[in-house]
Amino acid sequence: MGIKIGLVSLGCPKNLVDSEIMLGILKKAGYEITAREKEADVLIVNTCSFINDAKEESIRTIIELARNKINGRCRAILVAGCLAQRYPAELMAEMPEIDGLVGTGQVPEIARAVRRVLEGGKVLLTGSPGYLHDAYFPKVLATPPYTAYLKIAEGCDNRCSYCVIPAVRGPFRSRRMEDIMSEAEELANKGVKELIIVAQDTTRYGIDLYGKPMLDALLEGLTGIKGPVWLRLLYTYPSLITDDLIYLMAKSRKICRYLDIPFQHASNRVLQLMNRRGSKEEAARLVAKLRADIPGIVLRTTFIVGFPGETEEDFQELLDFMAEAKFDRAGVFTYSREEGTAAAEMPGQVPEEVKLLRRERAMMLQQEISLQKNLKRVGEVIEVLVEGKSLKGRGMYTGRSEGDAPGIDGKVFFKSGFNLQPGDFARVLIKGGTEYDLTGETVL
């Protein structure tokens, strides 16, 4: 019987791509991949450390998986990803459950790490995070077969005062356009219907290689690939959304009328403290332009509340902006004080209970906005990517519209007399809506 490897991927889709590459490398090296923890000889946790909640989830997962050393056949626990990159000494000193660490820059060395821990050694592979994968890296997709993430760059050159990403992921570095196209064509040949383009900052794509933003040129090339029906953009930085990109999105039916734009706040004073480029006024103009030039576009954003120095007036300014902009989707997070960041040392740290109350108030406002927007869609016929049968009843299915990214947005629950399969597209008449989801039935 061969050596079996299990992997748990935590955090964002960018981390999931690293997990897919690690699985591909291990499979190519002759290891068997298993989803059953108790069957694995080696268990890998690809961790996140972006905010405190993510760190706690990573540590909990490591402890839970380590129980398989007693109750299963597990011989070693490997920790990979951002937590390993950020806290190597602390993890090895304080968590004896861990047999090895693989940092964000050492993904290609995962097979060597597995080999070493199986021999009984301890492994510490953390160094400068300069790794950048290409189309030749083997991958095992961890997504449903009709959807895939396409990571076009690594690292980040933005220096937001609250963020550890540049420290754990390194400087921004783009993949070559022809290399991305090659991977996209391979995914299309495998039957992928939805390509989701990700990076720490997708709109910065190409600046380091070509001297200017090239996301629009990349997208134009991707629209020419036969196969994928939807191209979806995540993690766009507002100040780099160009007129050329907007024009391309408006004219191409392959690019989802959907943009994920983390504005983070609306008080210019707080934005300055966050070291974010742009202002509330520029954000408002961008939102208006996107809606005017791309009718029906769905806009998702994220905001941070309780940032150091945020006053009640600053927070009210954010609420007013949310009420005026009426984003289709919004995530609201409480500020997480991360050591090593400029914001962690700022005066005016906001008490935790105030942060939580502000988050609740912002989310209540957004839920009402989302509900009203969804109810206004009743009577529309939309295209839905079928994800499978729903447990809500006989003949019920679940899927997503072009306005719904997997894992972060809502669903469409619908009834159909057709025998639909995951990855099919269906035309659905919307008959109802909640804060997050739509309901309906298929039409011819």
UniProtKB/Swiss-Prot annotation:
Q: Which Cys pairs are S-S linked?
A: none
Q: Provide the binding site for [4Fe-4S] cluster 1.
A: 12, 48, 82
Domain MTTase N-terminal, first and last residues per copy: 3-119
- Reaction(s) the record says it catalyses: L-aspartate(89)-[ribosomal protein uS12]-hydrogen + (sulfur carrier)-SH + AH2 + 2 S-adenosyl-L-methionine = 3-methylsulfanyl-L-aspartate(89)-[ribosomal protein uS12]-hydrogen + (sulfur carrier)-H + 5'-deoxyadenosine + L-methionine + A + S-adenosyl-L-homocysteine + 2 H(+)
The kind of enzyme this is, by top-level EC class, is transferase
Annotated residues that bind [4Fe-4S] cluster 2 are located at 156, 160, 163
The entry's function note states:
Catalyzes the methylthiolation of an aspartic acid residue of ribosomal protein uS12.
The name this protein goes by in its record: Ribosomal protein uS12 methylthiotransferase RimO
The species is Pelotomaculum thermopropionicum (strain DSM 13744 / JCM 10971 / SI)
